[in-house]
Amino acid sequence: ADIVEDVRFLPNPYYIEEYRHKSGRVPCVRDYVESFPITQTYKEKWFDMIDFLLPNYEREGKSQLVIAVGCTGGMHRSVCMAEAMYKHLRDNGVDVSIEHRDIQKNDVEEDAPGYEGEA
Protein backbone atom coordinates (compact mmCIF):
# COMPACT_ATOMS: atom_id res chain seq x y z
CA ALA A 1 0.00 0.00 0.00
CA ASP A 2 1.09 3.56 -0.67
CA ILE A 3 -0.96 5.02 2.19
CA VAL A 4 -1.98 3.14 5.34
CA GLU A 5 -4.76 4.39 7.61
CA ASP A 6 -5.32 3.02 11.11
CA VAL A 7 -8.90 3.65 12.26
CA ARG A 8 -8.76 1.86 15.62
CA PHE A 9 -9.41 5.21 17.32
CA LEU A 10 -13.01 5.21 16.01
CA PRO A 11 -15.81 3.71 18.15
CA ASN A 12 -15.88 -0.07 17.69
CA PRO A 13 -19.22 -1.70 16.74
CA TYR A 14 -17.82 -5.06 17.83
CA TYR A 15 -18.79 -4.22 21.40
CA ILE A 16 -22.44 -3.72 20.43
CA GLU A 17 -23.90 -7.24 20.43
CA GLU A 18 -26.37 -6.60 17.60
CA TYR A 19 -23.53 -5.36 15.34
CA ARG A 20 -20.83 -7.87 16.29
CA HIS A 21 -21.43 -10.28 13.39
CA LYS A 22 -22.38 -7.69 10.76
CA SER A 23 -19.89 -6.07 8.42
CA GLY A 24 -19.21 -2.36 8.07
CA ARG A 25 -21.17 -2.46 4.81
CA VAL A 26 -24.44 -3.17 6.64
CA PRO A 27 -26.31 0.15 6.96
CA CYS A 28 -26.94 -0.03 10.73
CA VAL A 29 -23.23 -0.63 11.40
CA ARG A 30 -22.19 2.11 8.98
CA ASP A 31 -24.69 4.48 10.60
CA TYR A 32 -23.31 3.64 14.05
CA VAL A 33 -19.70 4.33 13.06
CA GLU A 34 -20.68 7.49 11.17
CA SER A 35 -22.84 8.81 14.03
CA PHE A 36 -19.85 10.01 16.05
CA PRO A 37 -18.39 13.51 15.61
CA ILE A 38 -14.86 12.05 15.60
CA THR A 39 -15.76 9.98 12.54
CA GLN A 40 -17.07 13.01 10.67
CA THR A 41 -14.02 15.09 11.57
CA TYR A 42 -11.68 12.28 10.55
CA LYS A 43 -13.44 11.74 7.22
CA GLU A 44 -13.30 15.45 6.39
CA LYS A 45 -9.56 15.63 7.12
CA TRP A 46 -8.80 12.30 5.42
CA PHE A 47 -10.77 13.16 2.28
CA ASP A 48 -9.06 16.56 2.10
CA MET A 49 -5.64 14.92 2.38
CA ILE A 50 -6.36 12.36 -0.35
CA ASP A 51 -7.88 15.06 -2.59
CA PHE A 52 -4.64 17.02 -2.16
CA LEU A 53 -2.38 14.02 -2.76
CA LEU A 54 -4.03 12.53 -5.86
CA PRO A 55 -3.05 15.25 -8.36
CA ASN A 56 0.43 15.43 -6.85
CA TYR A 57 0.97 11.69 -7.25
CA GLU A 58 -0.36 11.93 -10.82
CA ARG A 59 2.03 14.80 -11.57
CA GLU A 60 4.90 12.53 -10.46
CA GLY A 61 3.76 9.88 -12.95
CA LYS A 62 2.04 7.56 -10.49
CA SER A 63 -0.85 5.89 -12.30
CA GLN A 64 -2.18 3.99 -9.29
CA LEU A 65 -2.52 4.72 -5.58
CA VAL A 66 -3.24 1.93 -3.10
CA ILE A 67 -4.83 3.01 0.18
CA ALA A 68 -5.00 0.42 2.97
CA VAL A 69 -7.38 0.93 5.87
CA GLY A 70 -7.03 -1.17 9.00
CA CYS A 71 -8.64 -1.70 12.36
CA THR A 72 -8.61 -4.56 14.86
CA GLY A 73 -10.56 -7.20 12.95
CA GLY A 74 -10.97 -5.80 9.46
CA MET A 75 -14.73 -6.16 9.60
CA HIS A 76 -16.40 -3.01 10.91
CA ARG A 77 -14.53 0.31 11.08
CA SER A 78 -11.99 -0.25 8.32
CA VAL A 79 -14.69 -1.59 6.00
CA CYS A 80 -16.94 1.38 6.74
CA MET A 81 -14.16 3.92 6.18
CA ALA A 82 -12.84 2.20 3.05
CA GLU A 83 -16.38 2.26 1.65
CA ALA A 84 -16.69 5.96 2.51
CA MET A 85 -13.42 6.75 0.71
CA TYR A 86 -14.48 4.62 -2.26
CA LYS A 87 -17.75 6.57 -2.53
CA HIS A 88 -15.98 9.92 -2.11
CA LEU A 89 -13.48 9.16 -4.87
CA ARG A 90 -16.07 7.63 -7.20
CA ASP A 91 -18.41 10.59 -6.74
CA ASN A 92 -15.51 12.89 -7.66
CA GLY A 93 -14.80 11.10 -10.93
CA VAL A 94 -11.85 9.00 -9.84
CA ASP A 95 -11.53 5.53 -11.38
CA VAL A 96 -11.52 3.50 -8.17
CA SER A 97 -11.90 -0.09 -7.01
CA ILE A 98 -12.23 -1.59 -3.55
CA GLU A 99 -11.24 -4.88 -1.95
CA HIS A 100 -11.96 -5.94 1.63
CA ARG A 101 -9.11 -8.36 2.22
CA ASP A 102 -10.00 -9.55 5.72
CA ILE A 103 -13.78 -9.31 5.89
CA GLN A 104 -14.37 -13.04 5.39
CA LYS A 105 -11.68 -14.00 7.90
CA ASN A 106 -14.20 -12.98 10.56
CA ASP A 107 -17.42 -14.49 11.84
CA VAL A 108 -19.61 -12.45 9.47
CA GLU A 109 -23.26 -13.41 9.59
CA GLU A 110 -24.58 -10.39 7.69
CA ASP A 111 -22.98 -8.42 4.89
CA ALA A 112 -24.21 -5.96 2.26
CA PRO A 113 -22.99 -5.09 -1.23
CA GLY A 114 -21.45 -1.72 -0.34
CA TYR A 115 -21.14 1.27 -2.63
CA GLU A 116 -19.35 -0.63 -5.42
CA GLY A 117 -22.65 -2.35 -6.20
CA GLU A 118 -24.29 1.00 -6.94
CA ALA A 119 -24.52 2.20 -10.52
Model-derived features with residue positions:
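C-terminal accessory "lid"/substrate-recognition subdomains
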Residues: 1-65, 90, 104-107, 111-119
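Catalytic cysteine-centered active loop of the rhodanese-like fold, especially the PTP/DSP P-loop
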Residues: 63-86
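Post-Walker A helix-loop "phosphate-sensing" segment adjacent to the P-loop in P-loop NTPases
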Residues: 86-96
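Short beta-strand-centered segment that lines the nucleotide-binding/catalytic pocket of NTP-utilizing
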Residues: 94-105
